[in-house]
């Protein structure tokens, strides 16, 4: 396998050398957003710095408004889901639709207009007041409003539990092959530019939040760490330490993340926080958080172990984990997947998972920090480069730790499970 990876890395390197003057765009964000948990909505103001590193002059930018994918049954998302009976049943139960609107673009101080893609209401073209030259940058501001849908696919709410993903107006990728503006799909993931995020979330003070990046509110972060450490030390679901909300009715939490491809956040009043630190082989120490429900899957009591073991394993496979924090969040059941990854944080949607399966799903989603977040390939076009390689290494992790494979589960004969890890993996993979 090492020889395969070396060959694969060399091919990528040679390909990059063959590309004259390689470039990629950079998109930096400053977002202020307020959660209304009475009508399940977001009201936001977004400032984008778009840096044109391409050799081309750009007269417009394509944007994704992926929350509009939930708006009606005519979107690419709805059409894809409805292709089978299970999906049709999902849509029939989907009553609380969502959308994004109230956009008001200003580009370098000049009001700008946009056009909705004729085929996809979750894709728009922003017309720049003047062309953006190579090597130049532009400041884009817009307000936005999101009616948060009930949870059905990655983003949404389950009563007053919030999974806020693909939630802000986001420029599509422009690379050497041109624009990659595509609609949101249930089966089919993403392609995003790298950038820095400065996100302030205002919400009722009794919510616990997990998000991409580092929490800048020192008092809030200290309380999360203190509570989480005590809950890990207790090693039990009983007598967990609870979060104490500030006296004010609302709070504003600021998160910063550097050189990432996306930003997601999760908020719930019922989260049990668990926290530890992990020392990597280089001596670097990172924060490890998990957030789970008090009445959820009992196996989350060991979730810190799963995140840490997965992070250590993938650091040995691919190179050291590059970010300052790694987190996992327990979410509601998703009919189509066991979890969904975002930079530094992952949502796990497998409420009935066994010990081995929960460990496998958490490790798989944490593993995407290397493949989806660092390599940042076009997942819509080349899904195997993320999911395929990641699944192989997930199976390797399962074999090493449990002599387990999440496809075959308990069907694996006992004598096979007693074999050494390499032989076990050869037999079941």
Regions found by a protein language model. Give the residues of each.
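Acidic/His/Gly-enriched intrinsically disordered linker/tail segments
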Residues: 381, 387-429
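Catalytic Zn2+-binding segment of zinc metalloproteases
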Residues: 369-382
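Glycine/proline-rich low-complexity spacer/linker segments in large multi-domain proteins
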Residues: 73-86, 145-197
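Hydrophobic helix-coil surface modules that form long, contiguous segments used
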Residues: 174-175, 179, 189-363, 392
